[in-house]
Regions:
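Basic- and aromatic-lined ligand-binding clefts that recognize polyanionic substrates
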Residues: 58-62, 66-70, 170-231
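A short, structured surface patch at a secondary-structure boundary
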Residues: 66-113
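Charged, glycine-enriched surface loops/patches
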Residues: 62-66, 133-169, 176, 266-295
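Proline-aspartate-enriched helix->loop->beta-strand connector
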Residues: 111-113, 118-123, 141, 252-256
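Boundary at the C-terminal end of the N-terminal hydrophobic targeting segment
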Residues: 34-38
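Structured C-terminal subdomain patch of bacterial secreted/periplasmic proteins
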Residues: 255-340
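Bacterial N-terminal signal peptides
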Residues: 19-32
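Bacterial N-terminal signal peptides that target proteins for export
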Residues: 2-22
Length: 340
C-alpha cells in the first residue's frame, strides 16, 4: 500500500513540475510582452532626451534624493550610492533597501558595478555626473536632474520615467494637503505675527553654513510659509558659508533650526564656540526662550527626497506643539523693551 502511494506521489509531482514551470514561463512572457507593447516614452531632462520603453524594473539611483524618491514610488532599486552619513544606507531607508547593491560614492560611482547589474534605467544628477553621462547612457537609458534639492521635481520626473505618474501625483497631492494643514495650524497659533522668520544653521568642524530658501530644507520651510529676514537670502543661492563670528548678525531670525554635520567632538565644540560669542546672545531666537531647535541632519539636509521632507514636517509638528504662544509673547516683550 505504501509503495503504491509513493508511486502515486511521484507521478503527481512529475506531472505538476512541468505545469509549474510552464506557468512561470507564461507569466514571464506576459510581463515581457506587456512591456514591449507599451509605446516608447521620450523623457526630457537636464542633459537631453532619453527614450524609455515599458516599465523599468531594474533601477540604479546615483544621488540620495533619487534613492528616497524611488522608495516613495514603491520601487526597490537594484543599485544605490552610499549615503553621506549613517553608512552605507540612511536608517530611515534601510527597511526598504535590504540587500541592495552599493555602486560606490555619489561623487564617484563605479561604472563597472553598475554595468554588471544590467539596469534598465539610471537616475543621475548633472552636478555629480555630467562628465560621465555618456558612459552611463551606454550602460542603460539615463536621466539626469539638474536641481537635486527640488525634491518634488525629482518625484515627478522619476514618476514619468518609471511609468508611475499616477503614484507620483498621489504622493504630491498628499504632500500638498499636509503642508496646507500645517500652514493653517501655524497661522492660527501665531495669528498676526505669522509668518515667522527662520534660519537653518549647519555647524561643521571649522565653520557655519546657513541654508537659504533655494536649499532642500529652505524650500520646505518656504512652502510652509516661514520667511527669511534678509531679502538677499532669496537670491544668494543654496547656502552661505560663514567663517567669522563677526558675521553672526546675518543669521538673525525668530527661530533657529540647528544641524550638526557629524557627531565629531570638533563639530559640537564649534557650535558651543559660536553660542558663547556676545553677538549670538543678541539674536532673537536665543533671546526668545531659546527658540533654537536641534534637528536631524539626514532629514533636513542629506536625504534630499520626499520621504525626508515628510520627516521634516514630523519634526516641525513635534517641536511647535504648544510652543508658538511663548514665541509670540517673548517677541512682544522684546519689542516693548526696545521702545522704552
Amino acid at each position: 500500500m505504501i509503495s503504491k502511494l509513493n508511486r502515486f506521489n511521484s507521478a503527481l509531482n512529475s506531472a505538476t513540475r512541468p505545469r509549474f514551470a510552464l506557468a512561470v514561463l507564461l507569466s514571464f512572457l506576459l510581463v515581457t510582452l506587456a512591456q514591449a507593447s507599451e509605446s516608447p516614452r521620450q523623457i526630457r531632462h537636464a542633459l537631453g532626451v532619453t527614450t524609455v520603453t515599458g516599465t523599468p524594473l531594474r533601477i540604479v539611483t546615483l544621488f540620495q534624493g533619487a534613492t528616497d524618491s524611488a522608495v516613495a514610488l514603491g520601487i526597490k532599486p537594484i543599485g544605490v550610492v552610499e549615503s553621506w552619513t549613517e553608512k552605507p544606507i540612511y536608517r530611515y531607508l534601510r527597511p526598504a533597501l535590504q540587500g541592495v547593491t552599493q555602486v560606490g560614492l555619489e561623487t564617484q560611482p563605479s561604472l563597472e558595478t553598475i554595468a554588471l547589474l544590467k539596469p534598465d534605467l539610471i537616475v543621475a544628477s548633472t552636478f555629480r555626473h555630467e562628465k560621465i553621462y555618456g558612459l552611463l547612457s551606454q550602460i542603460a537609458p539615463t536621466i539626469a536632474l539638474d536641481r537635486v534639492s527640488e525634491f518634488k521635481e525629482t518625484v515627478q520626473m522619476m514618476g514619468v520615467a518609471l511609468n508611475r505618474e499616477d503614484k507620483a501625483n498621489e504622493i504630491l497631492f498628499h504632500w500638498d494637503r499636509r503642508v496646507d494643514s500645517l500652514r493653517d495650524r501655524l497661522k492660527a497659533r501665531f495669528g498676526e505675527r505669522w509668518p515667522l522668520s527662520v534660519s537653518i544653521l549647519e555647524f561643521r568642524e571649522d565653520h557655519l553654513r546657513t541654508y537659504l530658501p533655494a536649499s532642500f530644507a529652505g524650500s520646505v520651510l518656504s512652502e510652509i510659509g516661514f520667511v527669511w529676514s534678509r531679502p538677499e537670502s532669496y537670491t544668494a543661492g543654496v547656502m552661505q558659508k560663514l567663517t567669522s563670528k563677526e558675521s553672526i548678525p546675518v543669521v538673525d531670525a525668530d527661530l533657529f533650526f540647528v544641524l550638526l554635520r557629524s557627531d565629531k567632538p570638533a563639530v559640537a565644540q564649534n557650535y558651543l564656540d559660536w553660542q558663547a560669542h556676545p553677538l549670538w546672545q543678541r539674536l532673537h531666537a536665543p533671546q526668545q526662550q531659546q527658540q533654537v531647535y536641534p534637528v536631524d541632519n539626514v532629514a533636513w539636509s542629506l536625504s534630499g527626497g520626499i520621504l525626508g521632507a515628510n520627516n521634516m514636517l514630523d519634526d516641525i509638528e513635534r517641536q511647535f506643539a504648544g510652543k508658538a504662544e511663548s514665541v509670540v509673547k517673548k517677541r512682544d516683550i522684546a519689542k516693548e523693551n526696545a521702545t522704552r
